[in-house]
Amino acid sequence: MTFPRYILGIDTSCDDTGVGVVELAPDGSVQVRANRVWSQTVHAQYGGVLPELASREHVERIDTVTGDALAEAGLTVGDLAAVAATSGPGLVGALLVGLMYGKGLAQALNVPFYAAHHLEGHIFAAASEADLQAPYLALVVSGGHTHLFDVPREGEYVLVGATRDDAAGEAFDKVARLAGLGYPGGPAISEAARRGDPEAVPFKEPLQGQKGFDFSFSGLKTAALLAHRAGAKPEDLAAGFERAAVRFLVGTTLRAARAYGRETVVVSGGVAANRALREAFAASPVRAVFPGKGLNTDNGAMIALAGAAAIRAGRAPSPLSEGAVAYAPLASV
């Protein structure tokens, strides 16, 4: 089978303008050739992402980031054989920028266009890095998502558990903000936690005794707020919160791995960069696979990888009428 060689991927689902290029070899193997991300620092002053502002920033940056990605790959736009872009889930206005840009580029080049699911992109960011074959569990944990999937076969996704309230990354952001540690909260919490004492601010494990594999972070947020009001040191608060969140994520995932008989867990999304989370999984009985450098947070290379997977699986290109969707369950394809 002859595959399109160079695939461009675009992700504008939130506040990062990501464009990447992968090379799909005749044997089906795939290699990331470029991955460029423009992170919108303007949102830091607001303590969170402003959707309309994010959309405007994408419009201003996407052409430049695309050019940078092509230059990094040593290619011209005419070398592209397919284009993939995130269609959801995410901020609709932001998604539309990348989606319309990708469609227009594919149409101008007369090459196939593939609408990609943001969560599938995160999964492939780790799975492709290790040339991993199903079956495995996939934990996608980021600022907007906390989902646990069983992946019995490539392209088949069974939702095992999900957050009942906040996503893990969102909880990190909110706790960091109330403790005055800055934004984004993930790196801020991780850095402060190194200087803190987790025993100084104890947190109870959420959803104790549950038979399923769901997540919840509202209780940890409330406990952090109460500790802050009681005068807890920011670094101790960060240490206690991080330890509780990591134990909860890892413990729930390990229970699911035992229940589904999986020995390998893919861990992806922005929170996957957390040092404590990686160390906890490394010490666990499962094989934990994480994305490579630059592929944890939102990026275009992971969408190009999802496009490559669609091509290898023989999926038909997406219609140019494909729209952006804010909420899109990851269905088996």
From Swiss-Prot:
Cellular component GO terms, alphabetically? cytoplasm
Query: Where Fe cation is bound, by residue?
Result: H118, H122, D298
Name the domain of life.
Bacteria
Give the reactions, separated by semicolons, that this protein catalyses.
L-threonylcarbamoyladenylate + adenosine(37) in tRNA = N(6)-L-threonylcarbamoyladenosine(37) in tRNA + AMP + H(+)
User: What does the entry give for GO biological process?
Assistant: tRNA threonylcarbamoyladenosine modification
Q: How is the cofactor bound?
A: Binds 1 Fe(2+) ion per subunit.
User: Where is it chiefly localized?
Assistant: cytoplasm
Q: What is its EC number?
A: 2.3.1.234
- For this UniProt record, give its keywords in alphabetical order, as a comma-separated list: Acyltransferase, Cytoplasm, Iron, Metal-binding, Transferase, tRNA processing
Keyword hit for RNA-binding: no
Q: Which cofactor does it need?
A: Fe(2+)
Question: Which compartments is it annotated to reside in?
Answer: Cytoplasm
Q: Which GO terms describe its molecular function?
A: iron ion binding; N(6)-L-threonylcarbamoyladenine synthase activity
Which residues make up the binding site for substrate? Answer: V140, V141, S142, G143, G144, D173, G186, N274
NCBIfam families named among the record's database cross-references = gcp_kae1, T6A_TsaD_YgjD
Annotated function: Required for the formation of a threonylcarbamoyl group on adenosine at position 37 (t(6)A37) in tRNAs that read codons beginning with adenine. Is involved in the transfer of the threonylcarbamoyl moiety of threonylcarbamoyl-AMP (TC-AMP) to the N6 group of A37, together with TsaE and TsaB. TsaD likely plays a direct catalytic role in this reaction.
* Protein family per UniProt: Belongs to the KAE1 / TsaD family.
* Protein name, UniProt field: tRNA N6-adenosine threonylcarbamoyltransferase
